Amino acid sequence: MKLEVVGKNILRIDALSKVTGRALYPEDFYMEGMVYGKTLRSKVPHAYIKVDTSRAEKIDGVIKIFTHKDVPNNKHGVVFKDHEVFCSEKVRRIGDPIAFVVAKDRKTCELALENILVEYEEIEGVFDPIEAMKDDAPKVHGDSNIVYHFKIRKGDVEEGFKNSHVIVENTYKTHMVDHAFLQPEAGLSFIDEEGRITVIVATQYPHYDREEIASALKIAEDKVRLINANIGGAFGGREDISLQIHLALAAHELKMPVKVVYSREESFLAHSKRHPLIMKYKTGADKDGKLLALEAEIIGDTGAYASWATNVLRKSGVHATGPYFIPNVKVDSYAVYTNNPYAGAMRGFGATQVPIAHEQQMDMLAEKLGMDPITIRLKNMFKKGSVTATGQVLTESVPLQECLERVVEKMDFPVGEKEAY
Amino acid sequence: MKKISLNVNGKDHILEVEEDMRLIDLLREKLGLTGVKEGCSEGECGACTVIMDGEVVNSCLVMAFQAEGSSILTIEGLGDEENIHPIQQAFIDVGAVQCGYCTPGMILAAKALLDKNPNPTEEEIREAISGNLCRCTGYNKIVQAIDRAKEVLR
Amino acid sequence: MKKIGRGIGLSFYGTGYGNGFPDVSKARVRLLEGGKVGIYVGGTEVGQGAKTVLTQIGAETLKMPVEDIVFVHEDTVHMPDAGTAAASRQTYNTGNAIRVACENFRNKLKELAREHLALNSIYGLKVENGKIYLDFFPQKSLSFEELFEKSSKGDIEAEGEFVAQTVMMEEETGQGAPYWPYTFNACGVELEVDTLTGLVEIRKAVFAQDVGRAINPHLVEGQMDGGFAMALGYVLFEDLNLKEGKINNNKFSKYLIPTAMDTLEIEKIIVEDPESTAPYGAKGIGEPTMIPVGPAILNAIYDAIGVRITELPVTPERLVKAIQEHEKEKGEVK
C-alpha cells in the first residue's frame, strides 16, 4: 500500500491558533449580558445536610440560587447514576456540590456562598477501602460499599504453585493522583437563536454531556447543544459531568448567558482522580523461569462515587498478568466506595497501576532463579498467537519482543548472564 | 478606582482599574487579550506569563495598578498569522504544541530568555522555562523548539 | 552516597470501551464550496492530536491534501457521535469510521461523476487530488469544485460507521475477549539514587512503543514524551496528601508535577506492526505511553540500592526511610 499522507509529520492543524493565543478555551468566551455562577461544595466528607439559602437570596445582585429542588432529575453518572446534581440529603465527600449561585458578578457569587447556611449532621466516614468492605463499615451508598467484583479463573493455581520452583509474594500500594491538566474547568451557557440550551465547555465527550443535561432537565436531546471549545488537557479528568448540568440548568431557567470558571482549588475538588489500588500478588515460576501461576487480589478505592470504577477495576484485572502467558490464573478485583474524593478515568485506566506490581514480581522471580530480568521476560512474553488469561488469542500485531529487544540493545542490558541489568 | 496608563503590545492605554484588579484580569477582561491563560492563580504554572519591561512576570501575581507606566508584551503582540514570530514558527514546526494551554506563556518565557541570552544551552533553556508547567509534552519538544528558534534568530 | 541503577518495564494495553459494550464511532463527509471536503465527527481534540491524525486518515482515503479538508468536531448540532476521546480509541475507532465514510463518499462521487460525464459505469474511475477521472482516458474528468457547482449545494455527503469487536467476559471465569486491539511497549531507564537525600534522578531512558502504524510520528513522539513525564510524576512525587477525605495538596505550590528540569530527552523508538482491522494499521497509544515507565523506575531503584519499594509515591522521605530500614535489617542478619 502506497501511503501519501499517513506516516508523514503533517504539522498539527490546531498549532497556529494555539501559538498565536487565538485558540479559545471555554473561559475565553464572553457574551453581552453575561452573569456568573459559582458552586457551593461540601466541607465535610460524610453528613446529612439541611440547606437554607434565604439569607443569600436577599443579597443585592443575586439572581437565583439553585439546589436539588430545582433539578427535574437530580441524577447523573457515567455507569451508575449515583451522583446527584446537587446533594439532597447527604454529602459523601468533601467537595460534593450542594448549591449553585447565579449573580451579576463573581464577587457577589462569593458573598452569596458565604451566606448560604448548611447544617451538617456529621456521620462516621470510611476512608480505607479494606475497612469499607467490612459488613459493619459506614455505608456510602445503599447497603454495601462493594461496587464491583471481577474474577478471572483459568487453570488451577494451587497446582501451579505446587509445581513452582520459586514463588514471590508481595503487596503493592498505589496512591490517588490528579490529572492536573493545565486548564481548570470553565464554561458558558446560553440559549441559542433556535432556542436550544447551549453549553460551551471543554469535554472529552460532548454527546455524553448532552445526554446527561437532557436527562437532568427532562428535555429532548435535540434541545441541547454542546460546543466543545479548545481543551486544555484532559487525561480522563473531563469524562464525568462537572459544571455542565449546573450551567445548562441556569441558562434554561434564567434565559441569560451564565459563565463559570473554576479556580485550581475547585478543579481539584470537581473532577475524578486515579484509583488507588492495593494489589496482593503471588507469582510462581518453574526452575527455567517459566511462569506457572498467578494469584492476585486487587482492591480499588473509588471514593464517594463509582464513575468508571467497574471498567477501571475490570481493566486492572484483565491486565493483572502483565504481557505474559501464565497457564494458571486467579484474579479478584474489587471496586469499593469510601468517603474519599471520587476516582474515575485517568490515563491507563487501571492498567497503569498493575505493572507496578507485575513488573517488580518478574524481577524478583528472576533474582531468585539467578536469571537476568530480560531472559525471564523473553521466556514468558506475549507473541503472535499467545492466549491471554481471559482466553483471548492475540492473532496479529504483537511486536512486544521487538520493543524489548530494541530497548535492550540501546540500554546495553546484559542478557543471559546471572545478574540484573 | 485608579486611573493607570500603560503600553500593551505597542499600544498606549489609559484605563480605570479597581484597586484589587490583577494584571491578568486587566489584560483578559479590559483588553480582550485571552491568550493570557490562568492555570493556578498563585504564580506556579506560568500560563499567565507576560513580558513586562523586558522581564517575565506571572500576570496573576501583579496588581493592575503596579503596571502603571510599564510596557507589556502578550502573545497577541508577539506575532500573528500574517507576521509570525520565529519562536512561534519553531513551536509549530517541531511539534511543541499539544493542548496549547501553556503555549503562550511558554513562548513568552522563551522570548525573554533569547532576548537576554541568544545562545542558551539545553540546561539554560530548561531552567528558563521551569516556571512554566506543561502536562502534555514532557517538555522535550518545547526545549527543541526553543533551540531551533535560537538558530533562526541568531 | 550516589548509586546508579537500571531497570525495565513492559506492558500491554487493551484499547476501546471493551467487554462487548457497543463501541460505535460515526462520521459524516460532505462536499464543500471550492471543492473542499468537510469531515464531521464528534471526536474530541484534547491535545493528543486527534484533529490532525483523523484529518490525515481522511486525506489518505480521499487521496487529497490535508489543506483541502475541513475538520468539524466542535458542535453537536453538526457532528455525529464518535464516542468518547478516551480509552485510546479515537485513532482506531473514529479513524476507522472516517475511513469508511470517505470510502462511501468516494463511491458516491464516482456515481455522480458517471452521470455528469455521461459514462456507462463507474469502473476505471479514480478519485484523486480533488477530481474524479477515468484512468485510461483522463480527458473524462470532473473536479470536486465543478461537482459542487452542479449539485444543489452541500447535499453530496456520505456517512460511515465503525463498531469495534469485543466479547463480554463470563462472570465467574472472566473468559472472553475484552479488548481489541492491544498495544505493547517496553521502557528502560538508568537512574541515580542519592542515598542521603532520597532524591532520584533519571540519567537515561529508552522507550519503544508499538503503534501498529504511526499516522504521524511527531505526534506519537509527543505522546511518548508526555506519558513518560506523567509517569515520572506519578511514581516519584505527585501526592494529594489525602487525610480523612481531604485533599491537602490542592494547588500547584503543593501538588508538584514535573517541570522542564525534571524531564530529560528520552530515546524514542516507534515500532510498527500494522493491525489489519485498524485504519492504515494504526492502534491507539495515548494511554499506553505512560504505563511501562513507572515499573522501570522502581526496578532501577532496586538495582541501585537493593531496596524494593512497594508503595507509591517514592518520595525522598519514603526512600530514605526504606534505605534505613533495609540497613537495619541487614545489620540484624549479620
Locate predicted features.
Chain C
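Cofactor-binding beta-sheet edge motifs in enzyme active sites
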Residues: M1-K334
